[in-house]
Every structure is written in C-alpha cells, then in structure tokens.
C-alpha cells in the first residue's frame, strides 16, 4: 500500500548531476528523516497525527473522506522511521503517503482496474507542465492515472511525461494545494494549474504591528479578501465594504464621484469628535479624509473626500477590520472608532507575471424620482390655492364660516385653458442627470527571486457620475519591493503615487438661493422653460429665490490632488525568533481647487461673477521602531512579545483667494485681480500635530488551548491640553479553544469552537484644536481717525484640561465551525462606554467668545 517519491529517485538523481542546486532539491524530495520514538496507547488516528504534529513537528494534508480518522491505533514504536510509523497508524486502510521533509500528504490509494491494466488496453505517452495560479512551476507534483498503476512527479521546471491508458482521468496532487482531475482528450499535451489550499483556521491574519494565525486570535478581527469585492464598479475600497463584515456600515454621502463615504465600525459613539476609523496602509496610519483645498463657494457641500481614493483597489491583497479593544488598543488614542488595516499585494518568487484587465460599466439611478408634469403642477397649485383660501377664511374643515359670506373669492393661479395646454413642461431632474459611466485599465507585473521580490502596477480609472458634470479621473502607480539581504537583514519599500482630477458639481443641501443642483431641480417650477425669449436662463416667477437648475451646470469647479505615500522598513533577525524592525515613511498630499460662478446663475449675477483659487498641502511623517520576540518554553508554552516606539507628525498648510464683480465671465478663475469687489478674500493657515507613543503586547499560548493577550499603549500629543498631554490605553483578552479539549476532539462534525473575552480602553484624539487659545485678524475692523483698520480678536478660549475621549469596551465572542469549516460563523456581544465626550459650554454674554470646549460629565 505504500508509495513514496523515493521510488522515482533514479530519474531525479540523473537530473541532479547538472548542478548543486538541483541536487539539493532532489535531496529534499527523497524525504530523508531521522528515526522517531512514539507511543499510541489505543487512541484514534486523528489523535495519533496530532501527537506527531506536536511532538515531532510534522504537518499533514489529508481528506477526511479518504481515511477513517476514528480507527484506533495501539502501538509503542521506538526508533522507527516515519514510514513505519505511518504504516502502523493507517494499518488496513487503503492509503498511500508522500513525504517531503516534515510535510506528509495522505491520499487514497489508486484502485486497480483490470480493464485498464490489461495488455490489450491502448495507451499513449502524455506530457505537460504543472503551475500555480501565478504561472510558477510546481516541483514534485504527484501525477497518477486513476484506475491504473501509473504515476510520476514533475521535475524542477514543473514538467512531466507519463505513459497512460487512453481516455484516462489524470489526477494531480501536491501538498498544500487542491487536488485536480483532468480527463485525457485526443491530444498528448495536458497542463494543469493547481490552486493553493488554505485551511480557514491556519489563515494568517494581519493585526497591529504583526500577524498571527486566525485560530490564535483573542480579539474581534474580520478579514475581507479582495476577490470577494466588486472591483470593477467602485472608485474606492470603502464603497465595497458594506455588507461584507458584521458591524460595518458604509454609506455614500454624496453623489459626487470620489466624494465622502461614511464608514462606521460598530456605530457612532462620539457627539463632538470624529467617528471615522483609523486606516493603516501597509503599516502607515493615514488620516480620515483626503486633503481638500478650501473653496469660497456656497455650493461646495459634497462631503469630505474619501481617504482611500488614491489607492488602487486592485493593488489590495486583504483588509483586516479590528473591532474590539483587544485588537485596537495597540493604536491607543486613535483607535476608539476601530481600525482598518489594508495590505497591498507583494511580489512572488518566479519569472515575471504580467496581468492586464479592463472594465467598462454603466450607472443608473435606481428608483429615479418621478417629477410632476406642468399639467399636474398647475392642478396641484390650484388645489393648494383653494386649500389656502379655506384656511385663511376659517371655512370647513378649518372653521365654521359660511363661504357665501366671504367677499374675496378664490384666486386660482391657472385657468382651465392654461392647464389643458400645459403639456409635460420641463423635467428639471432629467435635465441635470444622465447615465453614468465607469471604465478602468489595470496593468501589473510581479516576480522575483528567493531573495528579491517585486510588484509594480498602473491603474487608470475614469468615472462620469449620474449627475451631469460630476467626473472623477485617477491615475495611480505602485512599486512594492522586498529584499532579503542575507540571513539577518531584510528591507522593503512600499510606494504609491496618484493623481486625481475631480469635476465638482454644486451639491449643497441648503434652500432658496443657496440650493444645490439636486435640491433646486427637485423643487423648481416645471412650467418654466430652461431659457427665456432672449436666450438667457429663465427664472421662475413663482420661485424667484431658487436658482435655475440647468444654469448651475455652468459653474466651473475643479480639484486636482497629487499624493505620494512611501513606507520603508529595515528588519534584522538578531537570533531565531527575535526581530528588530524600523519603519520610516511619509505621506505627501497636495491639492489645488479652482472655482468660478458665472453671472448666468442667480448667485453669480448678484456677485457679478465670483472666482476662487485655493491650495492645500498635508505632509505626514512616520518613524517607528519595534522589537518582536517569538519563542517557546517546552512545547506547551508559546510566547510572542512586542515592544515599540512611534513618532508621527501631521503638517498642514493652506492658502486661498477669492474675488467678485468681474466685467466678463471669460477669464473665469484665471484673473482674480480683475475683480472689483470692495474687499477680496485672502486667507492662509498652517498647523502641526504630533504624536509620540510607546506600546507593547504579550501573547501567551498555553497547550494551544488557552490564549492570553495583554496590550498597552501610551500616547502623547500636542493636540491635548497642557494638563493632559499623555494617555494610557490598556487591554486584556482571553480565548479558550474549546474544540481542542479531549471531550470535543472526537466530535467530527465540529471543526472549531472558541470563546473570546476582552476588556480594554481606547481613545479618540479627533478633538480638533479646541484646547488652545485662538486669535484671528480677518474681518476684525475698527475705525481710527478717518480710516478703517484691521485688528485682532480672540476667537477661542483655551482649555488646558481638554483631552481625548476614552472608550471602555467589553467584548464576548464565540467562533464556531462545522464540517471542516464548510459552515462557520461568529457571535459577538459588546458594550461600549464613552467618557470625556467633547462638548461646548456657553459663556457669559459680555465675554468676547460665546462658548468654550470642555469634557461632558455624563458618560454614554
């Protein structure tokens, strides 16, 4: 029953004469190993394999349908080879096994079929190549013809040749990959691509400053793979997360392509500070919004820009969502709203692999609002006039006045002839909307050697929104490099450059003359034509303070943003398990916004045309140093200890200028000096925020059953008041892998059962600059002599006691899986309490400032 790859050693050694590297590869394939001693005291096959895994370090790949894991084994084996041990474990079972170092693949032995093996059966020689999904060759893949005692393995380049009976089914199997079966056709070439097999519980999950197996997690962490997301139809990854993880809500808060997205993890807790989660991109913490130049434009309410706009979704490998205090406390004062860790794709060993994809899609407004026709509008206007007359004169049902006693009759705005000849009128909503379009192109190349791996990509994304003139164009490039210099040192660079151009439409939510495009279209009079007899935009006689919706499409408003995000690391494995690492990076964002409201619009006519230009720059720097020690004490005690330091600063600078009263619309925003406003607007700003942090984490694994995590972080920031510059954020967690207990090990249908409990504190540092005293000069005027002078005035009172909001969170979780994780799920219960909420207290009326920021006393 036994079949080993050593049976093919003659062919392999022949190939090994060509060089030392192939020889070493072949040596691995022969599965050389030392003898072992082990005792199986009448236990199940499953328990015996677990003993070999824990005691000798072997890994096994086996299909539960191919073997009887409940069969008993009773043997005491001393100084025996692994082959003998496996034969004893699987005694009287029709299996064979392949041994590669410490990896063992157990498969059902092929059944002999006399019809296929007979001397009269037709046979032919086939050949081919076996690769993984990246196109890289797989070495040592087992290839057999089902029903025939014929088999071979692939060589160093993934090629094979084999003589098999005609019309055979060829089975390709390899440790760590899904077995594939292909039916032999008329040709002699048969290639196969194997898919990597990942056990759900052995999946590696990225956490703060590290990674660990999913089975060892003590916190509430959800992983989202990008293959599960609709890549082709979305500007940013934020749009795609809705419905992909429990406790996550994602709401588009603007019709503007690339506009803001409200992303919340476990709801909103803050009333005065921010509720955005912290984003970590390849180890670099980024802010909650994209840099946005100010706009002196009353119609600029499109929501904050999405911070992930500049990231190509096709570059993302995985997304981890950290929800509870156990998983987020490592980020301290910035983690109260949860953490989203984004990991981009890396290169793989092998020849260059080039991927290209293109997508085209359309967008339509679902449930498009049906607008009144002119005839319907007139009819309803007459009904309203009558209802208003009844109300004003207190006629039933608004009173008991006799209608005949009223002198003033009802005045209807439209007569029957007007209504009959009205027709459909103007559908303003239809005129400002359209069928949207999205198209994009992605090109990537990846590859490398065992020491140097790379991934480079380029993406072009273009979207025309469903509201006319709302456009979004993005170019992104990425380069990820990892280089293992020697056995000790390794470095890597993750860099992405992006350029975004947005055409902004006036989407304000105000009323009357401040109405945005959609508001005005929803309320405008359908009896009014788009243009009057003179060819100018018509203004409704009934709605003199609401702008003509189509005229607002004449507004020019463009934003251009450039971003360069670079993060590099150098790490050294000082001794086995002890790794020191330094991260250094920067995030450089520059934005320019130009806007012009022409005199053809209602507001532009009042202002004589209004132009503005603004610029904004945000430059963030990061320096982090960590030491991670992973070690075992005996085989029962496993430790992972992390200690680190972090410094990050955020440097913001902006400038804007605006003018009005232009003699022509031709120059738009390109000649601010030609405006004749009495007082042009000029503004500038500059700020710097710093964080200095110390953090640590201890993970303790006892018997692979009982998991403990202790985490703490100390954050200091100049954003906090001088009396509260530093905060401490601790957490603790415990997890019990109940499935590993003896009373559940033999329950076959239950593949996982784990209980998690955590308690900890995190902070919300998004309190703005409310802790400090502010003075402003703009518009602070006084008369001295015969001239008007500009002075300064206090606009904000300092509060030296102001600090972060503190969230205390308890979390209980239960993870379960059935039928080898074919069915799995998680139950979570959590309770949050937030204290030191940011609020504002009213001051005495005689003071120059009306309110001061302070901490609310009541927790929520």
Where are these regions (language model features)?
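Short, acidic Ser/Thr/Gly-rich low-complexity loop/linker segments typical of extracellular
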Residues: 148-159
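Residues embedded in well-ordered regular secondary structure
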Residues: 223, 244-247, 256-261, 271-278, ...
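Short, acidic, small-residue-rich periplasmic hinge/interaction motif at the N-terminus
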Residues: 49, 53-56, 93, 99-147, ...
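N-terminal periplasmic accessory domains that precede
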Residues: 105, 187-193, 237-239, 262-266, ...
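Extracellular/periplasmic, surface-exposed regions of secreted and cell-surface proteins
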Residues: 276, 439, 474, 480-489, ...
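Short, polar/charged loop or turn motifs at beta-strand boundaries
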Residues: 36-41, 72-78, 129-133, 220-243, ...
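Non-catalytic regulatory/gating segments with a bias toward low-complexity or hydrophobic composition
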Residues: 143, 241, 248, 283, ...
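Cleavable N-terminal targeting peptides that direct proteins into the secretory/outer-membrane pathway or into
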Residues: 1-125, 165, 178
């Amino acid at each position: 029953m036994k079949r080993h790859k050593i049976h093919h050693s003659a062919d392999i050694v022949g190939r090994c004469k060509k060089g030392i590297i192939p020889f070493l590869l072949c040596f691995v394939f022969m599965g050389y190993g030392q003898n072992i001693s082990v005792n199986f005291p009448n236990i199940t096959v499953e328990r015996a394999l677990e003993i070999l895994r824990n005691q000798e370090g072997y890994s096994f790949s086996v299909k539960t349908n191919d073997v009887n894991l409940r069969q008993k084994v009773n043997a005491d084996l001393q100084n025996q080879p692994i082959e003998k041990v496996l034969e004893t474990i699987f005694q009287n079972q029709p299996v064979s096994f392949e041994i590669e170092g410490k990896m063992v693949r157990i498969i059902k032995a092929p059944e002999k079929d006399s019809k296929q093996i007979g001397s009269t059966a037709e046979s032919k020689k086939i050949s081919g190549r076996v690769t993984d999904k990246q196109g890289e060759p797989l070495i040592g893949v087992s290839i057999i013809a089902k029903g025939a005692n014929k088999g071979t393995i692939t060589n160093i380049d993934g090629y094979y040749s084999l003589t098999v009976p005609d019309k055979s089914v060829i089975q390709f199997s390899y440790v760590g990959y899904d077995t594939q079966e292909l039916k032999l056709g008329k040709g002699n070439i048969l290639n196969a691509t194997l898919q990597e097999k990942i056990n759900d519980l052995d999946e590696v999950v990225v956490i703060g400053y590290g990674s660990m197996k999913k089975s060892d997690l003590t916190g509430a962490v959800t992983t989202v793979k990008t293959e599960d997301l609709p890549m082709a139809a979305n500007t940013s990854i934020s749009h795609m997360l809705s419905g992909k993880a429990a406790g996550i809500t994602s709401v588009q808060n603007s019709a503007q392509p690339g506009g803001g997205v409200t992303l919340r993890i476990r709801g909103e807790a803050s009333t005065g500070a921010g509720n955005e989660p912290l984003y970590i991109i390849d180890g670099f913490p980024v802010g909650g919004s994209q840099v946005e130049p100010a706009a002196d434009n009353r119609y600029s309410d499109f929501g904050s820009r999405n911070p992930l706009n500049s990231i190509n979704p096709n570059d993302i490998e995985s997304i981890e969502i950290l929800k509870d205090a156990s998983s987020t406390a490592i980020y301290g004062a910035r983690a109260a709203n949860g953490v989203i860790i984004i990991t981009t794709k890396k290169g793989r060993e092998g020849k260059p692999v080039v991927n290209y994809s293109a997508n085209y899609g359309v967008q339509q407004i679902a449930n498009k609002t049906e607008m009144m026709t002119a005839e319907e509008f007139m009819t309803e206007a007459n009904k309203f006039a009558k209802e208003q007359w009844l109300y004003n004169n207190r006629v039933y049902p608004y009173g008991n006045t006799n209608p005949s006693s009223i002198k003033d009759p009802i005045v209807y705005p439209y007569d029957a002839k007007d209504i009959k000849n009205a027709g459909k009128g103007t559908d303003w909503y239809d005129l400002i909307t359209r069928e949207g379009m999205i198209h994009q192109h992605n090109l990537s190349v990846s590859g490398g050697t065992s020491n140097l791996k790379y991934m480079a990509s380029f993406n072009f994304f273009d979207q025309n929104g469903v509201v006319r003139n709302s456009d979004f164009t993005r170019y992104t490039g990425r380069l990820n490099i990892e280089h293992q210099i020697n056995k000790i040192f390794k470095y890597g660079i993750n860099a992405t450059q992006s350029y975004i151009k947005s055409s902004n439409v006036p989407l304000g939510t105000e009323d009357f003359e401040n109405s945005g495009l959609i508001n005005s279209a929803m309320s405008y009079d359908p009896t009014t034509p788009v243009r009057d007899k003179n060819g100018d935009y018509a203004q409704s006689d009934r709605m003199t303070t609401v702008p003509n919706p189509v005229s607002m499409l004449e507004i020019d408003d463009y934003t251009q943003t450039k971003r360069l995000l670079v993060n590099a690391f150098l790490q050294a494995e000082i001794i086995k398990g002890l790794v020191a690492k330094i991260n250094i990076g920067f995030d450089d964002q520059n934005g320019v916004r130009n806007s012009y409201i022409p005199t053809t619009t209602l507001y532009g006519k009042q202002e004589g045309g209004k132009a503005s230009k603004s610029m904004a720059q945000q430059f963030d720097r990061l320096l982090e140093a960590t030491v991670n020690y992973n070690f075992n004490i005996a085989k029962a005690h496993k430790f992972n200890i992390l200690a680190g330091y972090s410094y990050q600063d955020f440097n913001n600078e902006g400038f804007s200028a605006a003018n009005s009263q232009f003699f022509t619309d031709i120059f738009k925003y390109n000649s601010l000096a030609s405006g004749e406003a009495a007082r042009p607007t000029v503004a500038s700003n500059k700020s710097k925020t710093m964080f200095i942090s110390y953090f640590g984490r201890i993970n303790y694994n006892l018997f692979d059953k009982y998991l403990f995590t202790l985490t703490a972080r100390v954050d200091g920031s100049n954003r906090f008041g001088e009396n509260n510059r530093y905060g401490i954020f601790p957490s603790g967690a415990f997890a019990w892998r109940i499935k590993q207990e003896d009373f559940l090990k033999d329950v076959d249908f239950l593949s996982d059962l784990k209980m998690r409990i955590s308690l900890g504190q995190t902070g919300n540092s998004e309190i703005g600059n409310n802790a400090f005293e502010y003075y402003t000069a703009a518009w602070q005027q006084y008369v001295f002599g015969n001239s008007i002078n500009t002075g300064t005035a206090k606009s904000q009172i300092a509060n030296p006691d102001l600090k972060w909001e503190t969230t205390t969170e308890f979390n209980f979780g239960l993870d379960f899986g059935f039928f080898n994780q074919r069915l799995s799920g998680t139950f979570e219960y959590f309770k949050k309490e937030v204290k030191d909420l940011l609020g504002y207290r009213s001051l005495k009326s005689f003071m120059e400032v009306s309110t001061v920021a302070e901490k609310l006393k009541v927790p929520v």
